[in-house]
Amino acid sequence: MAAKEVKFGNEARSKMLEGVNILADAVKVTLGPKGRNVVLDKSFGAPTITKDGVSVAREIELEDKFMNMGAQMVKEVASKANDAAGDGTTTATVLAQAIVNEGLKAVAAGMNPMDLKRGIDKAVVAAVAELQALSQPCADNNAIAQVGTISANSDEKVGKLIAEAMDKVGRDGVITVEDGQGLDDELAVVEGMQFDRGYLSPYFVNKPETGAVELDDPFILLVDKKVSNIREMLPVLEGVAKAGKPLIIVAEDVEGEALATLVVNTMRGIVKVAAVKAPGFGDRRKAMLQDIAILTGGTVISEEVGMELEKATLEDLGRAKRIVITKENTTIIDGVGDASLIESRVAQIRQQIEETSSDYDREKLQERVAKLAGGVAVIKVGAATEVEMKEKKARVDDALHATRAAVEEGVVAGGGVALVRVAAKLAGLRGDNEDQNVGIKVALRAMEAPLRQIVINAGEEASVIANAVKNGEGNFGYNAYTEQYGDMLAMGILDPTKVTRSALQFASSIAGLMITTECMISELPKKDAPAMPDMGGMGGMGMM
């Protein structure tokens, strides 16, 4: 086992504090509408320019092991805030730095660290309750646009785009962010259910000008196996031909004789048919076939439940108003499934989202909910260069998370004002002893830090503006973008309650642990063994 270095008391805490301050100072320059960018060097490709707190925090690794421990703990604050609300990472870092700095001063002055932590925890619990009391529901598209604008660094176009996307696909719809082709941002909305499988043969195409298959009022046959024998399908094909409707087959695969016969039937105009592979793989494919069945009012023909393709009837087939199949995608528009069954399926998938621990699974389940419940919107981010594209994409992503958080828990006045108002309301809060009272004061003083940092980044005098805001009431605050005082809600400066709450809770949690640290242990750097000496020439080997 490697030898360890051990530091105690003030020596340990001062090293830890240095690390905290290095990381927090790098992150906090990005806060507010006039926050600056940070350039991150990459071992390959061009440097990345970002204004996203958590991206900056993740890049920081310090050489000194003890300083690095402090930095890594604050990095955890930013990471947790990002996971919980998707935004507010810089605010969380600024709060953590303020609590640690004030708290360690109190410890150095002889206060009991455990009582300080209890005081901080007490203040945070009370502050969260006050924040929720101040919170207002994010009712309309205008409020959603304002939240998105603030989170995207005062970019109004981004805010409006997100509000428009939410309006079109609903609050539960999936909104994804992708690289655009041009300089402008675009919004593409896919109505109905779309999955990433295209037609199995180009001979199915009936709209040559668009290269797509478009079928109106079709039957939908869902099969959970490979289909290669046409005899199995004859009863269904005959029934569909008599009904005079088109047919789309969604199966694990359609190949050989079966595919050839379908193509011939289509080209001769006997039956309009198209075949596509079922989306997903394994268990996910089975689940998605079931989703399509519920959406279209059909039944999945599966041998696992004792159903055979030869015995399938028209009653087993799903229906939809229209289906469009391109080379890459299939879109089912207006399935005729029972609304109550669709709702219960959505509720079931939501339950799975709550229970899953995998981010990948959660994302896929959310996509399934959106496909059943509304649709999918894609925001295509435009930029002149790849570096700008990455930076802008990160901002749009943040704004998207912030708007979702706002819809979930409502909004409070932005610009650090909500925390200042909460601190003022809790001025009379008391702990069980004097040390706890100091802990409460540490937390309440730290709640002013985000406002002060926003003002500092705007190049103004923090103390003057902080006092002016503290002397005001309600939503009165300072708009650093326009350099004016006024009602923050009226000026459209809103923060999601969830983002502010998460930032405060995670910051106080980690900062409290750091204040109560008394000893730090780190591995000593390994000393390299000295190199072998040069052998030189071997003696005594003269010529005979």
UniProtKB/Swiss-Prot annotation:
<dbReference type="GO" id="GO:0140662">
    <property type="term" value="F:ATP-dependent protein folding chaperone"/>
</dbReference>
<dbReference type="InterPro" id="IPR001844">
    <property type="entry name" value="Cpn60/GroEL"/>
</dbReference>
<dbReference type="GO" id="GO:0016853">
    <property type="term" value="F:isomerase activity"/>
</dbReference>
<dbReference type="GO" id="GO:0005524">
    <property type="term" value="F:ATP binding"/>
</dbReference>
<dbReference type="GO" id="GO:0005737">
    <property type="term" value="C:cytoplasm"/>
</dbReference>
<dbReference type="InterPro" id="IPR027409">
    <property type="entry name" value="GroEL-like_apical_dom_sf"/>
</dbReference>
<feature type="binding site">
    <location>
        <position position="51"/>
    </location>
    <ligand>
        <name>ATP</name>
    </ligand>
</feature>
<feature type="binding site">
    <location>
        <position position="415"/>
    </location>
    <ligand>
        <name>ATP</name>
    </ligand>
</feature>
<keyword id="KW-0067">ATP-binding</keyword>
<dbReference type="GO" id="GO:0042026">
    <property type="term" value="P:protein refolding"/>
</dbReference>
<comment type="subunit">
    <text>Forms a cylinder of 14 subunits composed of two heptameric rings stacked back-to-back. Interacts with the co-chaperonin GroES.</text>
</comment>
<comment type="similarity">
    <text>Belongs to the chaperonin (HSP60) family.</text>
</comment>
<dbReference type="Pfam" id="PF00118">
    <property type="entry name" value="Cpn60_TCP1"/>
</dbReference>
<keyword id="KW-0547">Nucleotide-binding</keyword>
<dbReference type="InterPro" id="IPR018370">
    <property type="entry name" value="Chaperonin_Cpn60_CS"/>
</dbReference>
<keyword id="KW-0963">Cytoplasm</keyword>
<dbReference type="InterPro" id="IPR002423">
    <property type="entry name" value="Cpn60/GroEL/TCP-1"/>
</dbReference>
<dbReference type="GO" id="GO:0051082">
    <property type="term" value="F:unfolded protein binding"/>
</dbReference>
<feature type="binding site">
    <location>
        <begin position="87"/>
        <end position="91"/>
    </location>
    <ligand>
        <name>ATP</name>
    </ligand>
</feature>
<feature type="binding site">
    <location>
        <begin position="30"/>
        <end position="33"/>
    </location>
    <ligand>
        <name>ATP</name>
    </ligand>
</feature>
<keyword id="KW-0143">Chaperone</keyword>
<dbReference type="InterPro" id="IPR027413">
    <property type="entry name" value="GROEL-like_equatorial_sf"/>
</dbReference>
<dbReference type="InterPro" id="IPR027410">
    <property type="entry name" value="TCP-1-like_intermed_sf"/>
</dbReference>
<comment type="function">
    <text>Together with its co-chaperonin GroES, plays an essential role in assisting protein folding. The GroEL-GroES system forms a nano-cage that allows encapsulation of the non-native substrate proteins and provides a physical environment optimized to promote and accelerate protein folding.</text>
</comment>
<protein>
    <recommendedName>
        <fullName>Chaperonin GroEL</fullName>
        <ecNumber>5.6.1.7</ecNumber>
    </recommendedName>
</protein>
<keyword id="KW-0413">Isomerase</keyword>
<feature type="binding site">
    <location>
        <position position="495"/>
    </location>
    <ligand>
        <name>ATP</name>
    </ligand>
</feature>
